[in-house]
Amino acid sequence: MDKLKVTLIRSVIGRPQNQRDIVKGLGLGRVNSSVVVPDNAAMRGAIRKINHLVDVELAK
């Protein structure tokens, strides 16, 4: 199964609580922190809700 590398590129300051919860749930903390997650429907749905805050690329 493929994996996605998700990098937080914008701060969650001033964002709604549901977006903050998604960022925290993915394991992202500070700006420029990255995490590798499985490429499945649940992760893609979470990433879609915060796509303006993160950068996503295929992990090698």
From Swiss-Prot:
One of its GO terms (molecular function) is structural constituent of ribosome. GO terms for cellular component: cytosolic large ribosomal subunit. Gene3D superfamilies: Ribosomal protein L30, ferredoxin-like fold domain. Keywords: Ribonucleoprotein, Ribosomal protein. It holds the Pfam family Ribosomal_L30. One of its GO terms (biological process) is translation. Belongs to the universal ribosomal protein uL30 family. Part of the 50S ribosomal subunit. PANTHER family: LARGE RIBOSOMAL SUBUNIT PROTEIN UL30M (PTHR15892:SF2), MITOCHONDRIAL RIBOSOMAL PROTEIN L30 (PTHR15892). This is Large ribosomal subunit protein uL30. The lineage of its organism: Bacteria, Bacillati, Bacillota, Bacilli, Lactobacillales. The gene is rpmD.
